[in-house]
Structures are given as C-alpha cells and as structure tokens.
C-alpha cells in the first residue's frame, strides 16, 4: 500500500461564534488520486481543504503531509499543496500576467533565470504565453482561472485543489478549465476538485467523497458512492441510470 500524501487526524475547526465547521475528520489522500469532494453549502468542504496547506489552524487534531504536521513545515506545505480558489480574481497580485505568475517563485528567493523558466513553462502549460504582458483584470473569467492555475504550477506542487472551479464560467471556460485539470492529473499531479457539478467532472475521478455537517459521510469509488449522494443533499446527475463515464463536458 502506498504511503499517504495527506492525512487528517481527528480534525476539528470551531469558529469564534461556537459553530463547529469540522467535527473530527479522519481522512487520507494518496498520491496520484483524482478526488471529487461534494456536499451541501456549509458542509465544511472549503474549511477542510484550507487546513491542508496551513491557511487555517485546527482547533484540535492535525493534518499530516508525508507523515509530518503541516504546521511544522508551512513553507513546504504551501509549495506542495497548491490551491485555486473559487474566485480566481482574488488570487491576482500583480499588474501583468507574467508578474502575477512570478510572484510565488520570487518569494522562494529563486534565481531570476529559474523564475523566468518557471513562469514561461507555467504560462505555456495553460495556453497564456501570448498574454504575458496583459493586465490580469483584462482577461476573461476562464483565462483568469487558467492564470491562477499557472501561478500554482510555478510553485511545482504535488497536489492541486480546485474549489468550485466551474462557477461563473461559460461553456467554453468550463471546457478549458476541465481540460487543464485532466491534463494535470495525467501529468502526475494529485487532484482534488470541490464541486456540486458532478455531471461535468465525475467521469475523470478515481474517488468520490461527500461531506455533511463537518465530516466525510461517503467515501469510495464513484460508482459505489453515486447512488447514495441525494441522502446528503447532493444532486445526482440525471437520468438516474446515466453512466459515470458520460459525466464530463469533454468530448
């Protein structure tokens, strides 16, 4: 059995108002997986993944990255676990596409040659090379999402988390984003996609997990989990007899 890339152990997160967002989550991620994580609004999905690279601190319990607590290796965790937020524009930090992607590597104090190499490779991977001098806010929603992916790729992560990556995108933007996610998995990245839109992506997943009330309630192969999702307020793609391999917007 492969060692776990990521583990949560009795993970609890309680907000200052007493609301418990995570309620003792025990969960594992193995390198190379493509996980779809779904659940109703407020079930704890985004709070959970923000613990994976130390953006949040647990109230109790811990997150282990390759067997070591995330909070003992924060810089390494933030390089290893990349995250593309639901609002891609919130990740824009610079005045040009090139400088935006360069921001992360610059903070690693890499050489200018290495930074330039990473930026150009990352922009090429997401198809934005010809836009490197453009202002990020002039990009379309789909292009901004690809820019956020490029910024993550420049950090050379092992795992990439996408939080509702299809929200607010038109058909072309969804297809471009999904193509990018699938390609990243094929290139060896571990992928976790938070989404309500199972019909857009489930065909590519190796695992489907459902959260409710701060814990993982269902976890397994997509074909084993799918028939139970509506018990946890997740819409099952219709018709009910639809094959999982058809649940993609790629053709």
Q: Language-model features: where?
A:
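Helix-to-loop junction immediately C-terminal to a conserved catalytic motif
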Residues: 53
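Conserved ABC transporter NBD signature motif
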Residues: 61-69, 77
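Conserved ABC ATPase signature
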Residues: 135-139, 143
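ABC ATPase nucleotide-binding domains
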Residues: 227-251
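H-loop/switch region of ABC-family ATPase nucleotide-binding domains
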Residues: 195-196
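The feature captures the beta-strand-to-loop junction immediately N-terminal to the Walker
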Residues: 38-40
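Conserved ABC ATPase "signature" region
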Residues: 113-131
